[in-house]
Amino acid sequence: MKYRLIGVGASLVVAVMLTGCQAKATTLVKSDAGQVTQAEVFKQIENQATTQQAVQELTLNKVLNQRYHVSQAEVTAKLKAFKRQAGANYHMILERNHVTEPRLKSQIKANLLMEKAVSAKYPVTKAQLKKARAAYMPMTTVQHIATTNEKQAQKIIAELNAGASFDSQVRKYQNNRQAHTTAGKLAQFDSYNQTLAPAIVQATAKLRVGHYVTKPVKTVMATADTKDKPTYEIINVVSRRSKTAAVTDDSGKQIDVTNYLREKIQQQRMMDKQTQVATIRSVFKAAHVKVVDAHFAPAFNDYLTTQNS
């Protein structure tokens, strides 16, 4: 699962400032021109967007922490999954977003709390699982040939139709040494893949094992070789796992396909803005959240009804 890091640092800094705002006489800076007090800083920042966001996040985290429990083991598992996805870029990602690992853990915990809130409000039904299972393409291995020339792509397919092997076509039309070494094979992927162009995943799902596309698959993805030019892909399905086979989840753990599909359905819901808003409204209402300081009312406009505020 992906985590949004941008803005986390700023929100946390403001949040720390706000948690101590009751001591309004506290002097933060002294100079010949006078003192800068915490009350002055609070007045300066209270209407800023980052401050509004920080107040909203503090409130949400308090409410969710009271209603749901996230263990340290759960946070650690998600952190390991994030590190595995980021690979060698892990520390660079943190540095670019001005986030330390402890702050990342806090954000992961907040995400997990929200996941549990969404799951509680919108439990996955048998009908939804049945639909997901029917649409699911399990882990599949494909060979591919990519070209920016549509006519050449059509020629490659014509030669395949005439009896040429896919391996020979890879050697003939791909200049990439790695493609020659792997016979054009891509890493295994399923229908939930978010790395490849959606058109490639969709085309693959329609093919049976041992079959290739009858028309080139057009994609537009920036790569070192193609820049932003349209790319025409010829795809051949080499193998496909059973729909009932165990699947490796985001944490690297083997789980049965039903739990995997349930996890994916919930992840998709977490990306849906309307679902998030409805869930937050629900937990705020249950916790009787009320904005006392009118300056912070805008932060809750989407989440509180007139009766609550």
Curated annotation (Swiss-Prot):
It is a lipid-anchor. It is an enzyme of class 5 (isomerase). A lipid is attached at residue 21 (S-diacylglycerol cysteine). SUPFAM superfamilies: FKBP-like (SSF54534), Triger factor/SurA peptide-binding domain-like (SSF109998). A lipid is attached at residue 21 (N-palmitoyl cysteine). Its main location: membrane. It catalyses: [protein]-peptidylproline (omega=180) = [protein]-peptidylproline (omega=0). HAMAP family: Foldase_PrsA. Plays a major role in protein secretion by helping the post-translocational extracellular folding of several secreted proteins. Belongs to the PrsA family. PANTHER family: FOLDASE PROTEIN PRSA (PTHR47245:SF1), PEPTIDYLPROLYL ISOMERASE (PTHR47245). This is Foldase protein PrsA 2. It comes from Lactiplantibacillus plantarum (strain ATCC BAA-793 / NCIMB 8826 / WCFS1) (Lactobacillus plantarum). The gene is prsA2.
